[in-house]
Amino acid sequence: LNFKPEADAQWQELADIYTEKTGVKVNVVTAAANQYETTLKSEMGKSEAPTLFQVNGPVGLASWKDYCYDLKDSEIAKQITSDDFLLKDGDAVDGIGYAIESYGIIYNKNLLKKAGYTQDDIKNFDDLKKVAEDITKRSKDLGFSAFTSAGMDGSSDWRFKTHLANLPIYYEYQQDNIENTDAIKGTYLDNYRNIWDLYVNNSTTSPKQLSTKTGDDAVAEFVTEKAVFYQNGTWAYSDIADIGDENLGMLPIYIGVDGEEDQGLCTGTENYWCVNKKASKEDIQAT
């Protein structure tokens, strides 16, 4: 069961090649965007449930660990160079990371240059704020805005209520050695608010229209060079590749914390492959 609709064609092609070489029939089912968990529950209830499925980390594992085959002795687990890429429950290896992704503020180098800046001018939140607000002041003359629309419909809001929210949570975890969410005090909520306000007040769209803006709108604004900055990750490359590799860059998401000049991109294992231990031995072995 495939999590990523944008990779469906590649998975179908791979399944055909595998079947041709091994004689083992592979059926790939791809969940619709934002419907993976619902689809997984439905598929797992069928007589021929998926042998290979995905979870998004410890949260997903909590729901599906009773279905996870221990991959500790598998060939693929032996090839992993770091336990950071494994999803473990005690000594058991329940999942193998397959999507190592980074996210930040993608930017158009050419537009940034037209505005009179380069990446070297943006090392922290204050720098980003200065550049964004200056672009906004001159947007009519420049012909573009600072940020793409920060749409709050289901196709876009995860960029902000999940990815952007990770930043203040991360810094609080680091500062207070927090190990569970119950201990969160909201130390960096003002920083979260500040970066969000910067997005919505310096974008292609009035803040009053954000509820109607979609992820596709943000992509279109960036690709048609209506905005310099676009918060997203490496998975969005195929959507924006027409701009040209030489014209694309990515900045860390700065929120105004001490030492953020040394901050890098947000990087992690976004999804893990799991094998359904309730499948037949033949299917498990083939997988």
Model-derived segments and spans:
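Short, solvent-exposed loop/beta-turn-alpha elements that line the ligand-binding surface or hinge
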Residues: 70-84, 147, 151-154, 168-194, ...
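Hinge/lid segment of periplasmic solute-binding proteins
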Residues: 56-110, 159, 165, 249-251
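Extracytoplasmic/periplasmic substrate-recognition and gating elements
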Residues: 16, 21, 25, 46, ...
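Alpha-to-beta junction loops
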Residues: 24, 44-55, 142, 224-232, ...
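Glycine-centered hinge/linker elements that transmit conformational signals in sensory
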Residues: 132-133, 178-212
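Short helix-initiation/N-cap motifs at beta->coil->alpha
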Residues: 30-39, 125-127, 209-223
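Extracytoplasmic/periplasmic solute-binding protein
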Residues: 94-98, 103, 129-181, 227
